Amino acid sequence: MHQRELVSIGKLDGKIAIITGASKGIGAGIARVFTEEGACVVLAARGNDVLQFADELQAAGREAVGFRCNVSDAQSCKNLVDFTLKTYGTIDILDCNAGICTLSDFLTSDDAWRDAHIGINIKGVWNVCRAALPTMVRNNAGSVVIISSVTGDMVADPGEVAYATTKAALVGFTKALAREMAPHSIRVNCICPGDVQTPLVKAWQANRAPTTPHMPFRRLPMPCPWDA
């Protein structure tokens, strides 16, 4: 596939960003774009692969460090913020990307399935925002980007009750938090992407009717414009 060459214009020169769920998929795509635009990024995810991804970006001349973090744990999020402040001194951007999606029939599902989605998709965003926002408030500046889903805002498929519920919650969370943070010159925005070529989507694509026939380009978008 032909790859377009995109030119960086340094939109984020000197900015310090935390990206959760940064080891793969949309989070990794955001990390590539942010660092290409000059940001220094702290990549957070649960597994060691986030450390390897940080090494990959460093090898390409980007400013990136990895940190293992479980966003469902409030203390882990505080540790992430402490690490960022110790490493870079401040936080300008917070990208809340970490999330899970597993399919299950609502009537036969157990509470563990529901609670897992709530723990990562809702509490995870809540925890990392609670940990990072005090720094932005002190700075009287900042930007929070929350990755929800079209599933939580427009349309959902069978088996996605837990996922759709938690992603819809993020839309309401964003609206309310944006109003609270506006007096501190902090922007809070929510993005609701559709299907993207990520490991998460590929894992459950086989259990759904294909969506690509309904798309103008007959293919799923890539998580990073450099891959398009």
Question: How would you describe each model-predicted region?
Answer:
Residues 16, 23-24:
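Conserved glycine-rich cofactor-binding loop
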Residues 37-52:
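Conserved glycine-rich Rossmann-like NAD(P)H-binding loop of the short-chain dehydrogenase/reductase
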Residues 105-106, 110-118, 216, 220:
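Substrate-binding pocket helix/loop in short-chain dehydrogenase/reductase
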Residues 109, 156-164, 176, 204:
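Active-site loop-to-helix junction immediately N-terminal to the catalytic Tyr of the SDR YXXXK motif
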Residues 129, 166, 174:
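Active-site helix of classical SDR
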Residues 134, 179-183:
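Alpha-helical segment proximal to the catalytic Tyr-Lys
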Residues 149:
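Residue(s) in the substrate-gating loop at a strand-loop-helix junction
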